[in-house]
Amino acid sequence: MENLNPNTILRVAVDLAKRVYQIHAVNQFEAVALTKAMTPGKFFDWCRSLPAGCMVAMESCSGAHYVGRRLAAMGLSPRIIAAHHVKPYRVAGAKAKNDANDAAAICEAASRPHLHSVPIKTA
């Protein structure tokens, strides 16, 4: 996974937390290209290597608008999705609620073309 070519990434989903962001990326064949936890600083550094216009999806939360503005400034396409739209794509089960599964559910929800997203608010 470290030899990953960022130009092959079609869509990235990130589960935002205070200290660690969980990343889930898929390629043009909808296959998982990367699943990794990163600090916010390393995440933004990594995002600079993504192709312009790459979709980066996240679940709506207090920090999502800040992250969305930073990603838009890098030339990426941020998409904030309301939590109730992500919930149907989560894996069922008692131990399924974790950051990695949440990021995968966000990625799956973002693949739906007619799913309403939250507009990014200005500072």
Predicted regions span which residues?
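Phosphate- and other anionic-substrate recognition elements at nucleic-acid/protein interfaces
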Residues: M1-A123
